[in-house]
Every structure is written in structure tokens, then in C-alpha cells.
Amino acid sequence: MVNRKWLLGLLLFAVLVQLSGCYPGTGTDNLLVPPKLTAEQDKIYQALEKTAGSNINLRYPQTGEYRSSFVLRNIDDEPGDETIVFYKTNVNTTNPTSLKVSVLDKDDLGNWYCAYDISGGGSDIHQLEFSSFGAFDQLFMIVGYNQAIVDTSNNNADSQLTASPRQASNVLHIYSYRSGEIKDLFSQEYSLMKVMDIDNDGYQEIVTIVDSKTGDEPSVNIIEYNAGIFYISQGETVAMDDSVLSYVNVQSGFIGTNQSALYLDGVREDGSTTTELLFYQNGTLQSARLEKGVVDSIDTRKAGNMSMDVDSDDVIEIPELHLMPGYEWSEYMDVQESDKLYFTHWKIFSNGAFQLKKISYFNMGFNYLFDIPD
């Protein structure tokens, strides 16, 4: 009987392993199978092979709206979409030169060909954005790279390179594509970035955040465009929370109905989560944390509780956790933290203070939320 139970248990374990898709002794690369290419993507891939050879490995942005190795956008001044492709020519190295960015276009017969190819600015792709800036219709490509090593010694004046002495985890490059040529216009280190109209002037800016992983104070920069030049806006600085070790989430939203705001979720050294809220007021960049009378308790909460737009009104709510009735005295009792239940008080910033929007129960583990009636 014992042997039969043992065999049954072993069989059940084997079935569960098969169903989970996990196999002992395999690495994560074997578990990540790229999606099957569409017919059009297959034509693009074949055109890429003619230029780059067959030993290529497609890469894709790790965050943001665009998560494909093949991104179709019209990035020049001619009709029709181009295709931006990210790939590596040697998958066994972190050498930045092994990462390539290729723009493919169609000829007069409708066949794809590689129009231009450049080396990437890092070891892998972190984020991809497209935007026009100022009163100009030209669409620019913003590529964020993971960087293994920061080297600021090769600044090229022609590329308007701007580098920070601190060592962030990523670096963005702004590219233009005109007359079949990619030009690298600007470069800046960052931890997180967001393309948005933060100063409410009707035009997009790039907001970059550098956290304090290297021991420096966290900072924010605003990249603007004028007269054909990208530059960091001078004087647009604000004191960031120096207790934040790293920022892990960035969102754009509003305060009220029309004031743009940037919401940054950061992690402190003790693992707790905090939110930095930045916005323009009276022509200067402001932090809600520094507003007079703002309660500090809104800033700190358990790890993993991120700000979000819970009611789809474009105003980001910031969570504040409160123990449910019956758990108030749990610290004096033998109750594990994982067994405690909390209500989430979702707060918004309005009229210079955080105000309660609604109360809900939010279960992060099972990803569900229900509101508590008033």
C-alpha cells in the first residue's frame, strides 16, 4: 500500500510539472518561446536576414506600450509605415555593439528592404516611445536601453550628447529618421522616463528620473525641443525624497480635470513603498510631498502597493492601508503579517492636500478589488 501511494504521488508530481511548463534543469531562455511571426513579419524578417545574416536574435522592449520586436510606424516625411526592428548578432555577449536597431522600408514594388542599421546604445532594449515635440510635426523615436557599463568619455558634439556623472541603469537615445538615415540627436541616463506634457503648454516633453542606487540624491530632468535641438530645461529641479532607493513605477495623470501630474512609486531601503507626486504650479515644478500641511502617512505603505487609476478618470489614486476591524491589536497578539487584512483608502491630491476618494479591499495576490460602500 505504501509503495502504491508513493508511486501515485510521484506520478502526480510528474503530471503537475508537465502542466506547469517547467522542466528541471532548464534555464529561463528555454521557457521563453517567441510568438509565431505573421506573414508580413516573416517578409520583414527575411529582408533583415539579407542584410544581417541568419545568426540573429530578435529583441523587444521590456516595458512601455510597444513590446514587439517589429514595430510599424511612419517615422519619416513620406507616406507609409517603416518597421523598426531590434536584434542581436551575437546572443552570448552583453557587448552593446552586438545590439542593433534597423529601419526597414518598402521599395516601389512593395518589397521590404533594410534602409538603415545602427548599433544600439546599450546591452538590451528597455523602452520605446514615439513623439513629436514643440510646434513641429516631425515624429522622433525615443529608445531606452539597458546599459551594462556607463562610459561618458566619448561625448560627440555632433550628437548633442548629455551624460550624467551618476550611473543610472538605463540610457535613452532620441533618433530622427529622414531621407533614409537615422540620426542620433541626444542621449541621457535615466532610471524611469515618461513622455508627457508636464507643464501644460500643449507640447510633449520627456521627463527622466534618476534614482539613488549609486548613493547620489534622486533627481528629475525635463527634456525639451526647440529650434532643432533637444536640451535639458534649466531650473526645472525639485527636491526629491532622498530616502527612496529606487523608483519602480511611473505614471502620468491629472490633478483635477486639466493639470498634468507625474506619479512616481519608489521603494525605500526597508522595502516600504512611497509615492512622489510632481506637477507644475506658477511656472515651476512642485512636489506634493513638500506642500505645507500634507500628511506624511500617505507616503509610506507596505511593499508592492502601487498607485493606480482605479476608476479610469485619468486621476491617479494613491493607496493608504488601514487594518480591518478586529486586527487593530494584532501587533500585541500572535498574528503573522501575512494573515492581517487591510482596507485600502484611495487618496487623490486636491487643493494642496491628499483627500479620500474611496475605500476598497484590494487583493494583490489574486488581482481583484471591490469597493466598500459609503
Please describe what each predicted stretch is.
Residues 2-27:
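Sec-dependent N-terminal signal peptides of Gram-positive bacterial secreted proteins and lipoproteins
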Residues 21-374:
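Beta-propeller-forming repeat regions
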